[in-house]
Amino acid sequence: MTSRRRTDHLERTASVHRQMELFSARVCDIISESDTVKRLRLEVAHPDFSFRAGQWVDFFIPGVDTVGGFSICSSPGLLKREGAIELAVKYARHPPAHWIHTECSVDSQVAVRVGGNFYFDPQPSNPVVDLLLVAGGVGINPLYSILLHAADLHRHTHSHRYTPGHTHLCYSAKNTTELLFKDTIIDICHERPDKFSCHFHVTQQSSDIEPQLQPYTIRGRISAEELQRYVDPERTLCYLCGPPPMIEKVSSDLQSTGLPEDRILFEKWW
C-alpha cells in the first residue's frame, strides 16, 4: 500500500480494520533501496506492538497534517528479534512520502498504527498451502513481508508448528534497477530451492540484464501461462498487490486456471 496519490489515506481505508492504539517509533536507519525508494527502519519499543505479514501502518509525522499509509515490508520475526519494522517508500510529492525523502533523518520521531485485512498469518491447525505472490512495482512491499515470514516459518518450524508448502513470487517492474529486495529474494530461493522460487519481469528494460539476474528475469509482463504452472486449485493461496489494472488482469487469469475467487487475495495501491 502507498500514500502515493492525494486521496486521503484515512478516508480511503475508513472501513478497513485497524488497531486502536498509536505507538511511538524512532527512525533508527535509512537505506536507499533504489534511486526512488528509501527504506526506513523504525524502532517500536512498546511490548504490545504487533502486526501480521502483509499489513500496513498509518504513519503520523509531527508537523505534517497528512497521515501516510505504507505497507510494512519486514517480517513479524524481525519485530520479535530486534523490536523493529521496515517501510520502503517511493518518492512522491504527497506530504508523508516527501517528508521521508527530504526531511526524515535517523532519530526522527513518528507514530504508527497497524491496519489492513490483507495478511498471511497461518495457525498451527491450518491446512498447508502453496503461496503464489504476484507483485507490481512497489506493490512488492506487503508480499516481501509475506515471503520473509514464510522463510521464517521454514527456519523455525519447531517453535511455530506450521510450515507452508511451496512459495513462488512473480514480481514485475519497469527495469531491474526498480526491483526492490532482489538480492534477498534470490538468497531465499538459493537457501531453500525446494520451497521457494521467483520470476522477475521487466517491461521497459533498455540495457542488458545483469548476469546474476538473468536466470530469474523475463522480459515482458506476467503471463497467464506462467501463473498456470504455479496454481493448484486445492492448495494454492494467491496474494496480489499492485496497480488496479494489473490486479484485475491477474485475477481474471487466475480464475481461468480454476483457482477459486476466495483463494485470490489482493490489495490495490494507488
From Swiss-Prot:
Q: What class of enzyme is it?
A: oxidoreductase
> Which controlled-vocabulary keywords does the entry list?
NAD, Oxidoreductase
**Enzyme Commission number:** 1.-.-.-
Q: Is Nucleus among the key words of this record?
A: no
What is any Pfam family matched here?
NAD_binding_1
Keyword Calcium (UniProt):
no
Q: What is this protein called?
A: Oxidoreductase NAD-binding domain-containing protein 1
**Gene name of the encoded protein:** oxnad1
